[in-house]
Amino acid sequence: AEALGWKVDKFEQQMKPIVTSVDRKSPYGFAKAGDVAGVNMTGQGYVDGAAKIDMIHPQQIEPELEGTHTGDYIVLKGSPAVSMAINPEVDGGIGTIAMIVNMIPHVINARPGLRTMLDLPVPRAIMGDFRDYIEK
């Protein structure tokens, strides 16, 4: 919101269980039919009383066992409008690790103190020697 020049005046968050209708087994856990297999997290950011940011973030084990095909979907309403789908989704752990590793030189180069992503360069893949990106 800050990068868009918006001031969020209210934030709402919802968390609802995802109950499975089939048995689900993964390397990380088991949920039998009727049990909770995950959580559907949603959140809205309001600007001038209108929901300008709407996030839907379900997390569950083995969703495909119930016929749910996951992906990352981004919709920007504007001029021009943007609608993007990434299927299959980028594994959250891998995506997070990639972001953290590629930001290491930028964090080292940052001024001391608490920083946000707005204070650092735009994230990108660094394919070379990280030492070449660290200021002396």
How does the language model describe each region?
Residues A1-D72:
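Active-site-lining helix/loop region of Rossmann-like oxidoreductase modules
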Residues I61-K136:
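C-terminal helical cap and adjacent loop that interface with cofactors, partners, or active-site loops
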